[in-house]
Amino acid sequence: MPIQVLPPQLANQIAAGEVVERPASVVKELVENSLDAGATRIDIDIERGGAKLIRIRDNGSGIKKDELALALARHATSKIASLDDLEAIISLGFRGEALASISSVARLTLTSRTAEQQEAWQAYAEGRDQAVTVKPAAHPVGTTLEVLDLFYNTPARRKFMRTEKTEFGHIDEVVRRIALARFDVTINLSHNGKVMRQYRAVAQDGQRERRLGTICGAAFLEHALAIEWQHGDLTLRGWVADPLHTTPALAEIQYCYVNGRMMRDRLINHAIRQACEDKLGADQQPAFVLYLEIDPHQVDVNVHPAKHEVRFHQSRLVHDFIYQGVLSVLQQQLDAPLAEKDDPPAPRPMPENRIAAGGNQFARPAEAREPATRFSITPSREPAASSGKPGGASWPHAQPGYQKQQGALYRQLLDTPTSPKPALQPPAAAELAGHSQSFGRVLTIVGGDCALLEREGGLALLSLTVAERWLRQAQLTPGAEAVCAQPLLIPLRLKVTEGEKQALAAAQPALAQLGIDVHTDALHVTVRAVPLPLRQQNLQILIPELIGYLAQQNAFDVGNIAQWMARNLTSEQTSWNMAQAIALLADVERLCPQLVRTPPGGLLQPVDLHSAMNALKDE
């Protein structure tokens, strides 16, 4: 077959495979377009879980008649125009793929009017060439998008849609996340003609807390500690639940936003988890709603098809900043009794971070503050007026754009001089608190496969290769239930000897617990499913080696087989970076807490700084 340019319809459907996963994906893309257009009210109408109808109506700036056809074309956008714009994304959308992708798998109608136009216009694409038809319509200033019969022309995709209740649940969660990101926008959600959610725009702090309680529940609001933490161009705001009152239901509330974009980032989650580790059990998770604002030049949002992940240029800096901000709030909550509302405010300096004091550039005294109220403990790195925004604290809101000349250069964070220590320090600050459920903080990567950690007042080297091996063993070892098996698209069929066949038959119960589904016949073995850690492996090599190992064993212990597989899996990482190391340690700390308490040989090696310093003095 010769190389040829794909037809527009086929190209758009391929792109839709990444952008349009389910009805909730459509809602997310279209609502983000409304927010980028400056809308202050968004109405979302859903029918049959989004399979029948998704209608998004806003009062934004609208689209000009001459641009309606372009709006439905691939890679057509008003968000960016040059490479410089791509390196500093401030809008939620920027690729120009959403409308074209959605229109290729559904019947999409776009109706819009700008303030300059006297009448509205409606556009829709149809036919194999996606030809756009534009005609007059009646509509106020703003835009309405109707998506009918999602996946009507791709039956395979439609077959994988879940029940109406499940799909609407995903839509409800997306709308909830967006409502938490933009307090200044009214969002109404209806399903099958019934109003399900009404999030009204709020401005004052008390109203924000009411909206927070509406979305996250009264239990979260009751134990929420407000954060406002700032250093240079980095700002962290939001709420974290008191770890001492965290319940499994509260732990489901983990919402994180980077420059107003909802995000799932393991680096941020690890920083928060590490800050709460002394107060959380091994099986507990923190609950939080946090907003991180950062120079757009220092974060890459163009790394995930659905823009769910970002990559920080200074990941260690961001990690330590978030860790310090959350930890300081939790320490204040423990060190200072809550004041009654009628009591006069008494200034009190914030204690230094006991774990990072002297070793973290963010650990320096804050300005005097008032005692916390019931809901908020808000240490601020700088006076509110220094942010240049009226009204002190700033919350998610519509911004006209990021100005490069505003704020100090991001790299000044690395050159921030150390603040002088206070004359009086709490006695407990002299001792460095240990990490009860953490290996410590990653300082740097050494040799490509080792992490240098700050741990229990000293330094240690951790082998990332060994840590990954232990993580795989934990993932492969069954607990109360067997490891979940992942079916292979094409089963693997191998020829075996009579001895290997007998060994496989004897080991079959153990293999089933490990998520390996094998079937034998006269001369062959067929592998139909493997556990998730094996999916990316070369099974043509690994499975014969596993069969050879089993043929040499007299007994088949599940733990021994899991250990053998963990040692023989091929690592995807040949050289680690900071973000990968932090994510790996977060998984190991969560799945293998026993390694933190009693590290096995080859995993952790203390670094003797005293001997090195004495050697330098002797010289």
Swiss-Prot record:
SUPFAM superfamilies: ATPase domain of HSP90 chaperone/DNA topoisomerase II/histidine kinase (SSF55874), DNA mismatch repair protein MutL (SSF118116), Ribosomal protein S5 domain 2-like (SSF54211). CDD domains: HATPase_MutL-MLH-PMS-like, MutL_Trans_MutL. One of its GO terms (molecular function) is ATP-dependent DNA damage sensor activity. SMART domains: DNA_mis_repair, MutL_C. Residues 339-400 are annotated as: Disordered. Keywords: DNA damage, DNA repair. GO terms for cellular component: mismatch repair complex. HAMAP family: DNA_mis_repair. This is DNA mismatch repair protein MutL. It comes from Klebsiella pneumoniae subsp. pneumoniae (strain ATCC 700721 / MGH 78578).
